[in-house]
Regions:
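Generic beta-structure capping elements
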Residues: 46-52, 238, 362, 382
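Carbohydrate-associated surface elements
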Residues: 121
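Active-site donor-binding loop signature of nucleotide-sugar glycosyltransferases
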Residues: 49-51, 235, 307, 487
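Short acidic capping loops at alpha-helix termini that bridge into adjacent secondary structure
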Residues: 39, 87-91, 115, 227-232, ...
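Short beta-strand-loop/turn "lid" adjacent to the catalytic site in phosphate-handling enzymes
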Residues: 81-118, 147-153, 186-209, 234, ...
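N-terminal glycine/serine-rich phosphate-binding loop of ATP-dependent small-molecule kinases
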Residues: 1-114, 142, 248-256, 441-445, ...
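A conserved helix-loop-beta module that forms one wall/lid of the active-site cleft
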Residues: 220-238
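Active-site core segments that coordinate phosphate-bearing ligands/cofactors
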Residues: 5-17, 23-25, 125, 131-195, ...
């Protein structure tokens, strides 16, 4: 197969795909990944590096953008070395990224003016409270599909402009650039040649109108962000320029970009309305494809752009859960209750039930469907007989309980029952959690062959753009389910468990009595 890259707005060239691969870059919250994918959607090689996160004050979460970039370039080099597959055999590159995380940098020097403010950061809660009091919530929801919450990028940009010396003046002079992590990577990987984001990442900023598919002037004014700072918005499957030659000698093209959860949706081949996936990563993120319909949630979910490829926008309902895998990290790193994350499944299964103990991991407040930035984490129901296994089991179960709340909210919003749930992410390999999830939801839970569905989705978007794969039907043929978890819990026990969870959540909310 060959393709004339001139049809993609690139220089005229003919590329043969024989013996070639797609490289996917997944820039996550806790690590960055480079993956080489073959024509069957199988992972040939991977390289991963951890990314440091700092917590300068309670509720504040930051990362160094230059370290993130260096780590991403590092794994790009490493995966080529490990596999023996170099840039002359890379047909295209796809990028997926942690969403909402905000970087502002100087247009002249290319240097960030502040650390990246991570999606989990809650420092802008007072700004959000002021906007809610001003009645801005309906404007934001009607234009963006999102709720007013510190989670999204808009208030993070505003905070940087208001709190970094000289930032307001530089922004007014047109000297600053804003981007989510994808934009930061694209700008630097292309040597400053491309300043762009894709529709899915733009839709997570609370500055982008998902109806007009453009930055919204009213929202930019609301958050006091100059339009000159904003990147160009492009299709998720399309041309984002070439990687600079000092990074990859043969300068492969970047042809796919999507926020990590939308990339996961694409990697699961959820191309049709009603298809739903849940990613168990640092947080949990459940998305349902709603096709060309923007479903306005009445149950604490957000509407967002799900897939933006082949000249077509497919929207999605999303429920974002802020603490999932990060809860296991907290048990290990902060409390010393477990020595490794993999130990959690064994400990959780070592006791017959949760012994009436519930863990609400509201370390960064609660996301969907509660949206309470001031909720606080709690463990309740402890007795003298409780052990570390009790707490670990309650922590594992919390992922499934939170996902249950989101899925039921989705069903209420669309008026349909979800018949199965596709899952990915690191915690999807925890058999205890997946079985408990199936038991709570009372539907089959389908475990994919790889936990790296996000990277696969990024690869698919890039490969489609250059003709490496012909169409969506070919991608669907690649999809492989390795295990199905079927529900076994009695209805009586299920309701008993859920009643205890609901009571625990009420205690964690900021308005708890």
């Amino acid at each position: 197969m060959s393709l004339n890259l001139g049809s993609l707005g690139m220089e005229d060239a003919s590329f043969s795909f024989g013996g070639s691969y797609i490289m996917a870059l997944d820039c996550g919250t806790t690590s960055v990944l480079a993956t080489i994918v073959d024509e069957y959607g199988c992972i040939v090689a991977q390289a991963r590096r951890s990314v440091k996160t700092s917590f300068p004050r309670p509720g504040w979460v930051e990362q160094d953008p230059t370290e993130v970039l260096a780590s991403q370039i590092g794994v790009m080099m490493e995966v080529q070395f490990k596999s023996g597959i170099h840039s002359d055999r890379i047909a295209a590159i796809g990028i997926s990224n942690q969403r909402e995380t905000t970087v502002v940098w100087d247009r002249i020097s290319g240097q960030p003016i502040y650390n990246a403010i991570v999606w989990q950061c809650r420092r802008t809660a007072p700004l959000i409270d002021e906007l809610v009091e001003q009645g801005a919530e309906e404007l934001v929801r009607s234009r963006t599909g999102l709720t007013l919450d510190p989670y999204f990028s808009a208030s993070k940009v505003q905070w940087i402009l208001d709190n970094v010396d000289g930032a307001r003046e530089s922004a007014a002079a047109g000297d600053l650039m804003f981007g989510t992590i994808d934009t930061w990577l694209i700008y630097n990987l292309t040597g400053g040649q491309v300043f762009a984001t894709d529709y899915t990442n733009a839709s997570r900023t609370a500055l982008f109108n998902i109806h007009t598919l453009d930055w919204d002037d009213d929202l930019l004014a609301l958050f006091d962000v100059p339009r000159s700072m904003m990147p160009e918005v492009r299709w998720s499957s399309g041309d984002y320029g070439r990687v600079a030659s000092d990074i990859m000698t043969n300068m492969p093209p970047i042809m796919g970009v999507a926020g990590d959860q939308q990339a996961s949706l694409f990697g699961h081949c959820c191309f049709h309305p009603g298809q739903t996936k849940n990613t168990y990563g640092t947080g949990c993120f459940m998305l349902m494809n709603t096709g060309d319909e923007i479903v306005e949630s009445k149950n604490g979910l957000v509407s967002t752009i799900g897939i933006a490829a082949d000249g077509k926008i497919s929207y999605a309902l999303e429920g974002s859960i802020f603490a999932a895998g990060s809860t296991m990290n907290w048990l290990r790193n902060n409390m010393g209750i477990i020595s490794s994350v993999s130990e959690s499944a064994q400990l959780a299964a070592s006791i017959n039930d949760n012994e009436g103990c519930y863990f609400v991991p509201a370390f960064a407040g609660l996301g969907a469907p509660w949206w309470d930035p001031r909720a606080r984490g709690i463990v309740c129901g402890l007795t003298g007989a409780s052990s570390r296994a009790t707490i670990v089991r309650a922590a594992c179960e919390s992922m499934a309980y939170q996902s249950y709340d989101v899925l039921r909210a989705m069903e209420q919003d669309v008026g349909l029952s979800i018949e199965r749930l596709s899952v990915d992410g690191g915690a999807s390999r925890n058999e205890f959690i997946m079985q408990f999830q199936a038991d709570l939801l009372d539907i089959p839970v389908l475990q994919c062959e790889t936990v790296e569905t996000t990277a696969i989705g990024a690869a698919y978007l890039a490969g489609l753009a250059v003709g490496y794969w012909e169409d969506l039907e070919e991608l669907e043929q690649n999809a492989q389910i390795v295990r199905t978890f079927l529900p076994h819990m009695s209805a009586e026990r299920r309701e008993q468990n859920l009643a205890g969870w609901r009571d625990a959540v009420k205690r964690s909310l900021s308005n708890a009595q």
